[in-house]
Regions:
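Active-site core of glycosidic bond-cleaving carbohydrate-active enzymes
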Residues: 324-354, 403, 410, 420, ...
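Acidic/polar, glycine-enriched structural segments that form the non-catalytic walls/loops
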Residues: 9-30, 34-320
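C-terminal capping/lid segments that line or modulate ligand- or cofactor-binding pockets
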Residues: 22-54, 331, 379-383, 439, ...
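Bacterial Sec-dependent N-terminal signal peptides
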Residues: 1-10
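Active-site neighborhood of glycoside hydrolase catalytic domains
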Residues: 408, 414-423, 442-452, 456, ...
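Alpha-helical scaffold segments in carbohydrate-active enzymes
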Residues: 293-300, 350-357, 424-436, 472, ...
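A conserved hydrophobic secondary-structure block that centers on an alpha-helix together
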Residues: 111, 123-128, 407, 412-416, ...
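Helix-terminus loop motifs that line ligand-binding clefts
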Residues: 302-316, 342-403, 409, 416-420, ...
Length: 666
């Protein structure tokens, strides 16, 4: 197994990249749950800006896609007429400070200046970002600064503007850009301005070129002089606001009047609140940093009250078109539910708001209830490319949504939410399964012709995970009805009790009715032990683990499978195997210079937050033994082991009661 090392490994909060190689660079993301800003090897610029909930139908797969937005924080520095670039600087380092959610960079330009820059996606302002820049002159010099806005590729009708506005008694100079998305469906807008220190205000000019514009200022600096300023701005689309161009201007003026110090204080306060829910590992500094990195990305890619869920790549880029899959409900939701239920609730709000679309999807396919799409975007209708079998046939996602809703109630005990939002989801997904099953001659219920969770198994009958999550969904519906004192459909428990599962002669669970031992893309059967918890017998769990771990190829398979192996081995008491698969779940997937996680070993598509969610489940529910009680509700702890060299794990502010759990190595 390849284990990658990255600089700054012993710091629990800061990942340092001290060798910036533009040819082997996979950027880090600072994000606030709405606005994702992805770093670049080029100083003070971004490689990508991503807006959550912003889709247009173009390009890949002829379905809705995430859009690259305006990189409104991009800044160029010239010193004595020479622009600072990657090829004329030295000692360029970058750091991700996860505790404060900031991307920091340092560089030296010739013998003339040292520069420090910091990029923030402001947590308190979902559509706003800021970059602070500090220059220390090592000689007398002339500094020229340009904040640039370029029209993103494919955007049309570009309208650049420069305005000098009187806001109260303050003059604010705004640079704004407005375009249409590639099909013209959305209006896209961005605005930015400079924030100067101590009320000073150099003369700000403006320039335009084809498809771009900039605002600029110049000033002389004496040797030893330190000068700091900031670029602040906002971006949004008509998916977020009916008048985005004026709203980004208003938000930019708001930031201008707040000032740098207050903006940073509010940002840090929000991240202090998020990090009150923490995982603290005693005895392994590298694992501590890695776990913080995974938590950081989950926190960064979602925000309370947004009504949005998370794509497999979060806000780190355009991977998977920004669509929402089972990844959200099965892999990311459970750790967030324990750490920050209010963030997890946003993911369920997303599903609840799209329940009418799920009903129509079931109707289109001849079923009852609600059938959630395999790939979901803004509308909640199916957004899988027509060339993929998963859209019409990977039905397990419906059960994942229904079970997630019950898990939320189990942890929070929020009966009002269950009545108003949770039960409609749980009931209608259960109704779907009743209409989806077929009663066989064996008096068992079968779910035929599906794509398995192991997606290499297409158009198979009785996939283990599909049947298992459907069975659990049906059981949860009956429990939810009892919790609310409403009448349950008798068919829910009848179908659940007679759901078909296949086994080999030696007792190993068979992945589907015709499975003959082929390699698997990702775990399927093993999910029956967790999170479905259908298989509870120690020997059966171990037999299934031993069989299917040997069916997983070394490469080209998603990262979360090994996380489930690790979790189950921890619960079975096998600490060495648990540690091996814990590392195997993400270490070979890390990419330079920050160790961002790709989907597969040797992959090049970070950040795979699905994998992070899986590993966090390993730590919380495997090594820590935390468990959601589906029957009695609430959280409990089950017996488990942690890696031998770990001394303890502390979980802080868990669940709505914000409990603390400390688990010591035995």
């Amino acid at each position: 197994m390849l284990i990658c090392g990255f600089a700054g490994a012993q710091d629990p909060w800061v990942i340092t990249a001290d060798k910036i190689d533009a040819h082997h660079y996979y950027g880090e993301t600072v994000a606030n749950g709405m606005l994702g800003l992805v770093s670049s090897p080029e100083p003070m610029t971004l490689s990508t800006t991503v807006l959550a909930g912003c889709y247009d139908k173009f390009g890949r797969g002829e379905v809705s896609n995430f859009l690259c937005g305006f990189d409104f924080l991009d800044t160029e520095l010239e010193i004595d007429g020479e622009r600072i670039r990657t090829d004329n600087i030295t000692r360029h380092t970058q750091r991700l400070d996860m505790r404060n959610a900031v991307l920091e960079g340092d560089l030296v330009f010739a013998d003339k200046a040292r520069v420090t820059y910091r990029i923030y996606s402001l947590r308190q302002l979902p559509f706003c970002g800021m970059q602070t820049i500090e220059i220390v002159a090592q000689k007398d010099l002339t500094l020229t600064v340009r904040n640039c806005q370029n029209n993103p590729t494919g955007f049309t009708g570009y309208k650049p503007r420069f305005e000098s506005l009187e806001v109260g008694r303050t003059r604010v100079r705004l640079q704004s850009s407005e375009s249409r998305s590639p099909t013209g469906r959305l209006q896209m807008a961005a605005c930015s301005t400079f924030l100067f220190p101590n009320g000073s205000c150099p003369e700000v000019g403006h320039g335009e070129a084809d498809g771009s514009q900039h605002i600029t200022f110049s000033l002389p600096l004496k040797k030893g002089e330190r000068y700091a300023f900031a670029v602040v701005g906002a971006t949004m689309s008509s998916a977020h606001h009916p008048d985005p161009i004026n709203e980004v201007k208003r938000l930019t003026v708001y930031c201008r009047m707040q000032g740098t110090a207050r903006l940073l204080a509010d940002h840090r306060r929000e991240w202090d609140r998020l990090w009150s829910s923490d995982i603290i590992i005693d005895g392994d500094a590298q694992s501590q940093q890695d776990v913080h990195n995974m938590m950081y990305h989950l926190y960064a890619f979602l925000r309370e009250g947004s009504g949005l869920s998370v794509s497999p790549m979060g806000l780190s880029g355009l991977g998977y078109n920004g669509h929402v899959f089972w990844d959200a409900d099965t892999w990311m939701f459970p750790p967030l539910l324990l750490l920050h239920p209010e963030l997890a609730k946003s993911m369920l709000d997303y599903r609840y708001e799209r329940l009418p679309a799920a009903r129509k999807n079931a109707f289109e396919h001849g079923y009852k209830g609600a059938m959630y799409p395999w790939e979901s975007a803004e509308s909640g209708f199916e957004d899988t490319p027509a060339t993929a079998m998963t859209g019409p046939f990977e039905h397990s996602v419906t059960g994942c949504v229904g079970v997630a809703a019950w898990q939320y109630y189990c942890v929070t005990g929020d009966k009002r939410w269950l009545r108003e939002e949770g039960y409609p989801i749980i009931k209608e997904t259960a109704d779907y399964w009743v209409s989806r099953v077929t009663l066989g001659k064996d008096s068992c219920y079968h779910i035929n012709n599906v794509v398995a969770a192991d997606e290499w198994a297409e158009n198979v009958d009785d996939d283990a995970f599909t049947n298992g999550i459907a069975q659990l969904n049906l059981q949860c519906a009956a429990r939810a009805a009892r919790a609310l004192g409403v009448e349950a459909d008798d068919r829910w428990e009848e179908v659940a009790a007679r759901m078909k599962f296949w086994r080999f002669d030696d007792g190993v669970t068979r992945e589907h009715a015709t499975y003959q031992g082929q390699d698997i893309k990702q775990c399927d059967v093993n999910l029956l032990a967790f999170p479905v918890k259908r298989i509870t017998d120690h020997d059966r769990i171990l037999a299934d683990l031993d069989y299917y771990r040997r069916k997983l190829p070394e490469k080209d398979t998603p990262a979360m499978t090994q996380a489930i192996f690790s979790l189950l081995y921890a619960r079975m008491g096998y600490r060495d195997m648990a540690w091996y698969y814990f590392q195997d779940a993400y270490k070979p997937n890390q990419l330079p210079p920050f160790g961002v996680i790709a989907e597969c070993k040797g992959g090049t598509n970070p950040y795979f937050v699905t994998g992070a969610g899986g590993v966090l489940q390993t730590v919380l529910m495997g090594f820590g033994g935390l468990d959601i009680d589906y029957e009695q509700t609430g959280l409990r702890q089950v017996r488990s082991v942690m890696p031998g060299h770990w001394k303890s794990i502390k979980f802080t502010a868990i669940g709505p009661e914000r409990k603390e759990y400390v688990v010591y190595n035995r």
